[in-house]
Amino acid sequence: MGRYSVSPVPKCLLLMFLGWSGLKYYEVNAAQLREYHIAAQLEDWDYNPQPEELSRLSESDLTFKKIVYREYELDFKQEKPRDELSGLLGPTLRGEVGDILIIYFKNFATQPVSIHPQSAVYNKWSEGSSYSDGTSDVERLDDAVPPGQSFKYVWNITAEIGPKKADPPCLTYAYYSHVNMVRDFNSGLIGALLICKEGSLNANGSQKFFNREYVLMFSVFDESKNWYRKPSLQYTINGFANGTLPDVQACAYDHISWHLIGMSSSPEIFSVHFNGQTLEQNHYKVSTINLVGGASVTANMSVSRTGKWLISSLVAKHLQAGMYGYLNIKDCGNPDTLTRKLSFRELRRIMNWEYFIAAEEITWDYAPEIPSSVDRRYKAQYLDNFSNFIGKKYKKAVFRQYKDSNFTKPTYAIWPKERGILGPVIRAKVRDTISIVFKNLASRPYSIYVHGVSVSKDAEGAIYPSDPKENITHGKAVEPGQVYTYKWTVLDTDEPTVKDSECITKLYHSAVDMTRDIASGLIGPLLVCKHKALSVKGVQNKADVEQHAVFAVFDENKSWYLEDNIKKYCSNPSTVKKDDPKFYKSNVMYTLNGYASDRTEVLGFHQSEVVEWHLTSVGTVDEIVPVHLSGHTFLSKGKHQDILNLFPMSGESATVTMDNLGTWLLSSWGSCEMSNGMRLRFLDANYDDEDEGNEEEEEDDGDIFADIFIPPEVVKKKEKDPVNFVSDPESDKIAKELGLLDDEDNQEESHNVQTEDDEEQLMIATMLGFRSFKGSVAEEELNLTALALEEDAHASDPRIDSNSARNPDDIAGRYLRTINRGNKRRYYIAAEEVLWDYSPIGKSQVRSRAAKTTFKKAIFRSYLDDTFQTPSTGGEYEKHLGILGPIIRAEVDDVIEVQFRNLASRPYSLHAHGLLYEKSSEGRSYDDKSPELFKKDDAIMPNGTYTYVWQVPPRSGPTDNTEKCKSWAYYSGVNPEKDIHSGLIGPILICQKGMIDKYNRTIDIREFVLFFMVFDEEKSWYFPKSDKSTRAEKLIGVQSRHTFPAINGIPYQLQGLTMYKDENVHWHLLNMGGPKDIHVVNFHGQTFTEEGREDNQLGVLPLLPGTFASIKMKPSKIGTWLLETEVGENQERGMQALFTVIDKDCKLPMGLASGIIQDSQISASGHVGYWEPKLARLNNTGKYNAWSIIKKEHEHPWIQIDLQRQVVITGIQTQGAMQLLKHLYTVEYFFTYSKDGQNWITFKGRHSETQMHFEGNSDGTTVKENHIDPPIIARYIRLHPTKFHNRPTFRIELLGCEVEGCSVPLGMESGAIKNSEITASSYKKTWWSSWEPSLARLNLKGRTNAWQPKVNNKDQWLQIDLQHLTKITSIITQGATSMTTSMYVKTFSIHYTDDNSTWKPYLDVRTSMEKVFTGNINSDGHVKHFFKPPILSRFIRIIPKTWNQYIALRIELFGCEVF
């Protein structure tokens, strides 16, 4: 018998010991135990550290009290030395797949804090996050470690969460304190976590495959939200502001792994740029890393150009606020390992491109044509020069291309409207050399800086914030009237990757003062192409048309020419107040290619053409620019989407196939300014080129128009002056210097002289969008927009018969005949007005109790038929949808018909993303030149009905076999911003063929749709103007009382997210908010991959505006977990929910048959005779052994079970009964359930009807089991018989488990616990029987079927060895019968240990004394007790205290493994 220790122990220390004493069992299987000793401690932090001699003279105003993570030696007495570069960041934690990370944490601060990882496998007591997950005290110690206390966190790096095949060697995540996300982060509690592939780390933790690795955190600290408040907003890299980040060091030809973290407690984006360098991210070549607050990125870079290079976020406010540092690349004598030697044949393909570009000052008209459809308010604010505003014309500087170095002959006579304000397109493929002869014809210094290629310092053309004036070279700032030549070669390390488009989109601009130069107008597009992507004419080989769209925000208030513009265009310049918010706003121009409104001309394309779009975001914008393409989809990075998100100063290349006739809109999705200013219409037309074959007549004009877009060399010399495109002696010399030419191949020189004839000129112009050239040169140059057609775009559309009414069925039929393999799916959806309540609020401190939470809104609701009389009630599968409209499901090649009824009080419509539709089913209003017949869909009046018809082409669905369904959205498009904030939005799921069942649900997958949105009720149609926030509140940034961050419109408490462990769960995530609505989704305890991109592991998912993401998860940890945004302020205010993972073996009898459920817990609407409800127990015996009732007309009988706690129910077993020889049974039934006994829900399941009817019994004895899916959580269950034989009769068992999980049998009854693992103080043995401890198994049959001790006294015990640390949550006890003697234990206590030596009694939490449990009252019944808190132990003993006749025990233990 072991030694007992019952001396009082402090509760927290006891629980901590219990939680981690079993760690040794986990060490055996670990590839490596990586131990870290980390403390949270107070530190005075200076964001702008001064040199030591200066810091002694004055105390910085940028010193703040922070809490930071620091690494210590084992005894927490000596802090470990750390890299100065790490700044505020905690130590970088690293682990390979198979490792275990053990973090010994001590809190030296004055606030409770924790450590929570964004990605790792952990148990509840290593999560480091506090929320209502139903766990016990022992599992909550990690949530918030008090000051002065310690805790040990254990994280497992499993293959399931490790980097996938396509991932880099190490993935970047963050760890941070999760007690209060906003205050903890702003106080400084954050560090980096690198999860790496097996074998990728050296013994010291560094990466094997890189020369260097660096962690940089781009962050915004709001010191007013620090625990130690001091108003200040700091824009930093690793906590350093104003360029004080210590220089990042590298050697030429180093391969560097970058681990970049973005953090802010409010929504924030970062455009991370390394001047003069290119990077590779996820197998795509980039020059700017797109980063959002709360997410991380891993990228790599190979460097070759020496010098000191700027590291910055190109978001204008970040640069101005000092978020920058430097990368210092030195020549360390390393060999060039980056440049591949070329054969002579490869060398011959190298081209030298020479451009002559000038900076010139012009008067720019942002809206030369203002269509009548332009919004009046927008026009008054931005385009009119009333109220002493400047208006739409401004003096600006632009890049202009010339034919030669004389700069007297522009490549065009009149400024081409199609290009807008952009400079000429610069194109080059890998290994080409580009020379830009730049002449500054403006009145102040300018330069040219290019993105996306590696350049030397003399070709950089950029002035840094810290550059002293004496160090500004000629190339960095070209003075007025001066000329400078920028020259560089596109290196192998700059080449687009295999996954990239043929040409990737970059930009160039002046960078003397980047913000002001761009605001003045100096921008242009740059294409970096693969080595075979361009023809010798500079035209893309794999695209019919190349199209550029630059979404630029010109802040004219920051232009060099503001004073000039005020003097020239304001009616009373002397009275202008430049700091007046209205005046300032009027000068911020949202443009597409420099145009701030729609144009009367329409960009035109041929039907079936493949258009390569190059889209870029430029300017002072500090938000994402979501670009929406109507009627078509972008193919970008292997994914079809109709919204592309552009980060500031970055570009995307996308392919669009013109396959939908009509006039459509390319526009920015989001704010009023963006959607009105950043837009252009384009025509997808099916017509014959009437001028085909007339090239000779148009020869001269063709030359002129080709000149505009083809490379300068082509323009510079015609037939009489041919262009030398490739290798000449000079280029060979350059190639040799760069190591590109093999010595053995350098034996001859080659001149590939090409002459451009007129046919080629016209071909180039045609590829660039110019279909025909008529009339004079001047006329053509005034109308360069491709196919700027004035005629009716639909005149030749064979689908339209103006004499007949629109018939939706005919449209659907035509689609189906075209495809010949789809189905028609019909939906009936109405817009209805409701009162929506955002309460209950989960955290009272977040919002004032007096704040209004109930608002009038409009929502989409599904109906059963076209009468719109009977709503289609949502069931368990729809419970989580909240404010979302019904899910519209279809398979690829289907046709969707939606009959829409507007039951609201104002016009609404339906607009679908991702699907194919005619103009008559678009559901959006703009000047698309449609006939009236095609405009009826734009806005359906109140009480009106309209049928939308949408086709599902293959591009709308999953892209490969691993993807099951793809998500899109629909919403009202009358005014998308106001309509969505009013509540009118719903999901579309497009699935593979055969994935949808007869009930219109997906087969064999569990799916959820989550809509992340900050609802701004002030943007709703129904919000009273009198209640809106005042202008003063908006100016000072007061958080609106009327904004509600929520998931599916429900803050904190979204219901219905229940799933099984290890099943495939598909989450469809939507974000249709504005440009600043950025959410980073984190599922605690789980990891996931994006559908179609399973080769990449995700820990968190950035969800950008207009994003529809489908992710796949295999939940590995049972319990209730937190789903949230990593944007702290939104998380704190309600953008979070709980999801429950249930054990796949959650089908345990809940206790009707065993008697655990007592008679008093069973009730009914009535009964007949002695057939009382308490008898309704499965397999009950006796004359009266069931519940039975006589059903009377108009009565609806029921039987109810009160489980006395909320549990998970996954199945129901039913049985009838026999009365003499008569069978009594229920043939069919449905059931209802409730959590409180007041509000009852009818189970609907997969059925489309109002309730699901279950098949009952076919006789009075057979057991029928029905599976309940989805599983439900309830306390009360009622069964309602609807069909029966003779009488409604039930014997019942409910199947399920505990909500908290960890409630599966541990193996006594099943035999999983071996006989040798069950021991006792003694056991009874006679000549005819032996009552050994191994017989103490629940429900064991036989003559000797339990454990009996040798003697009956209080010193006896039964012991079970569970072999490893186990969480034990409950116990069932049972007695036994010997002959006619009934034996059972009436009371008992529990002791446990982890070392089989020092035993501890289980204590009563109320008295802190040993708890005595009530045992059995008979020999065969079951009694179940729950351990709250649970026991964490390997060994457990049951000690009988009192008994009936003799001690006899049969038991089962319930729980789960700890690790």
From Swiss-Prot:
GO molecular function, one term: signaling receptor activity
Protein name: Coagulation factor V
Cellular compartments annotated: Secreted
Binding-site residues for Ca(2+), renumbered to this chain: D142, D143
Propiece residues: 772-817
Tissue spec. comment: Plasma; synthesized in the liver.
Residue ranges, annotated region (B): 693-817
Oligomeric form and interacting partners: Heterodimer of a light and a heavy chains; non-disulfide-linked. The interaction between the two chains is calcium-dependent.
Functional summary from the UniProt entry: Central regulator of hemostasis. It serves as a critical cofactor for the prothrombinase activity of factor Xa that results in the activation of prothrombin to thrombin.
Primary location group: secreted
Source organism: Pseudonaja textilis (Eastern brown snake)
